[in-house]
Design a protein with these regions (language model features):
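Serine/threonine-rich, low-complexity intrinsically disordered segments
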Residues: 7, 19-22, 311-312, 316
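Intrinsic disorder/low-complexity segments enriched in polar/small residues
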Residues: 5, 32, 183, 321-323, ...
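Low-complexity, Ser/Thr/Pro/Gly-rich disordered linker/stalk regions
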Residues: 29-308
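Bacterial N-terminal signal peptides that target proteins for export
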Residues: 2-16
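C-terminal outer-membrane/trafficking sorting elements
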Residues: 311-353
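C-terminal segment of classical bacterial N-terminal signal peptides
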Residues: 16-28
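Generic low-complexity segments that are intrinsically disordered, proline-rich and/or Lys/Arg-biased
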Residues: 11, 27, 32, 105, ...
Length: 353
């Protein structure tokens, strides 16, 4: 079986490597298809324009939530393409951030990149997401910009503050010089534009930064807060983020909802420079590449091909964390069961446990 066919089959099966045991999983232990809500790695696509039609096929949505929309045909299809990235990553999504673009809309400036709101086929109180990201050489970070993340309910963004506990969002941002933060909209936030949470583990590690010319891996875990009574949510919602295999954010005092009907129910591929004013805009065309968009109800390996480092009871900073991060990577397998190396294989599944 050719690598291209294997990878296409893998994408169709929504497969990712992950583990669920509190102990390190044995080699070959893989996340089952039922755990994975969505998986898109673009190996099923030919090189060329990636528009709304392709996005609708790949980013599967549920049949009852009509809030989904796709905006991947910006600037006559020039913003969104599948490109070949080499043997390790294969086909990936390349988004263009044109000179002068600010915000998600067209208005009087070129439209930035692309947008997808994906109502998930499964909802949960706890959900994981992950993707790989590559800022191409010459990318201008300027004052900052938005990156994909999870949200739920009304998915508050922009200058709409959640005041009735009916929605939240936890997108990612790059800030000046590529500094990485989580932009969270929640009950009690200080800013009308959401609150920044730095990826520095509450000041205990150096601030994480996106750099150009390097593939980074982002893994997010969002857990809904409990409800004391309808309309009265507890302040124990939790957002955790791993950056290139290291825990960079762990905040567990969030009031994300006031009703237990509000879940993690959408993946929001929202990306653009801004802000809204001209000083946020790039002075030349810039590009970001994306791969392996994953949403799962079960844990996701924070390093490609590595055992899970975030099993229940061990995902906070503690004595076990560094030992687990330094553990020998799990073996990766092709669909036919043979041992392989390389990134795409790390996301293929050996079906069953």
């Amino acid at each position: 079986m050719s690598a291209k066919i294997r990878n296409t089959f893998s994408a169709a099966m929504f497969a990712v490597t992950a583990t669920t045991s509190a102990a390190l999983a044995p080699a070959g232990y893989a996340q089952t298809v039922s755990d994975t809500v969505s998986f898109v790695n673009f190996e099923n696509r030919e090189v060329g324009v990636y528009g709304n039609a392709e996005a609708k096929e790949d980013f599967k949505r549920n049949d009852y939530d009509k809030s989904w929309w796709y905006a991947m045909d910006k600037n006559n299809g020039e913003n969104s393409k599948v490109v070949y990235d080499g043997e390790e990553h294969g086909n990936v999504l390349q988004l263009k951030y044109p000179k002068g673009c600010v915000g998600p809309n067209d208005n009087d400036t070129p439209a930035c990149a692309g947008q997808i709101i994906q109502p998930l086929v499964k909802t949960a109180d706890t959900m994981w997401s992950a993707y790989d990201i590559f800022f191409e050489d010459g990318f201008e970070f300027q004052l900052g910009g938005k990156l994909p993340g999870l949200c739920g309910g009304k998915c508050y963004t922009g200058n709409a503050m959640p005041e009735t506990g009916d929605g939240w969002s936890a997108r990612i941002m790059w800030r000046k010089d590529g500094n990485a933060v989580q932009l969270i909209y929640f009950m009690g936030q200080e800013s009308v534009y959401g609150d920044d949470f730095k990826w520095d583990l509450n000041g205990t590690i150096p601030q994480k930064q996106f750099t150009t010319g390097t593939w980074h891996r982002i893994v997010n875990k969002v857990s809904m807060n409990t409800i004391a009574s309808p309309g009265n949510g507890d302040k124990n919602g939790r957002v955790q983020t791993w950056f290139d295999g290291e825990l960079a954010l762990d905040v567990d005092t969030l009031r994300l909802r006031d009703y237990d009907t509000v879940k993690v129910d959408k993946f929001y591929l929202s990306t653009f420079h801004g802000g809204s004013s001209a000083e946020w805009a790039p002075t030349h065309d810039c590009f970001i590449r994306y791969d392996n968009f994953t949403v799962s109800t079960d844990s996701i390996a924070v390093k490609a091909g590595a055992p899970d480092t975030t099993a229940p009871g061990t995902d906070r900073i503690g004595a076990q964390r560094q030992d687990r991060l330094n553990a020998t990577p799990a073996k990766a397998y092709r669909i036919d069961g043979s041992r392989v190396g390389g990134k795409k294989a790390n996301y293929e599944v050996k079906v069953g446990r």
